[in-house]
Amino acid sequence: MRPVSDFDRIASNIAIWHGYDSAVKAELYSTCLGTSGGNYLIDPIPLESEALSELVGSKSVAGIIVTNCNHHRASAEFAEKFSAPLFGRTEAFPNKAEPDLKRVADGDKIYDELTAIDIEGAVEGEIALNYAPDDGTFIIGDALINFEPYGFTFLPAKYCSNGKQMRRSLRKLLAFKAKRMLFSHGTPILSDASERLRSLLDGSL
């Protein structure tokens, strides 16, 4: 897909960028988290060089995080460009061994207050992330979406390996507090994210 020309900063240390990929006929969203240990790029799609330089700024890129087996996108290119390791579940890389892959498991801390949560029953290798600073932020792979005509809801059942199991797994997120929720597919939720998630999960019982 073509490189995106710009990004949106939604907090001092959080930015997103997005673009349409005709190959999958979907709008794809990517996230940059700025930590004291460097930037983490999550499910990155291509970004024009000038915008990328502005996004990264003076900080190093500490890692590229892949949230499931379908979200490799430009991760390999970014990892090579910045000499940064890839982070993800082993199941997210089923077809090849990545020499610089740092495997993550449920509850692992990728960095300080950045935690990975396994989401079983969604797409193979699915994780969600919780970034605790500034009232908390969830970053979701495919298990939750927020775009029309669906709105904020679960990944449609036809794309899940086990929808009921996915809903149970998503309840693990309720152990964390998050003001914001960012998606790989959909518009960010910028307030009351934990409450919105609880309402969605309770309504699915």
Model-assigned labels for residue ranges:
Residues 19, 23-63:
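Pre-active-site segment of Zn-dependent metallo-hydrolases
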Residues 48-89:
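Active-site metal-binding motif and surrounding structural segment of the metallo-beta-lactamase
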Residues 48-49, 69-74, 93-96, 145-147, ...:
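Active-site environment of divalent metal-dependent phosphoester hydrolases
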Residues 1-5, 21-38, 89-98:
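An N-terminal domain-start capping segment
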Residues 26, 48-51, 71, 122, ...:
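Amphipathic coiled-coil/heptad-repeat helices and related helical stalk/stem segments
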Residues 2, 6-8, 12-16, 21-23, 77-80, 84-125, 133-134, 161, ...:
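Metallo-beta-lactamase
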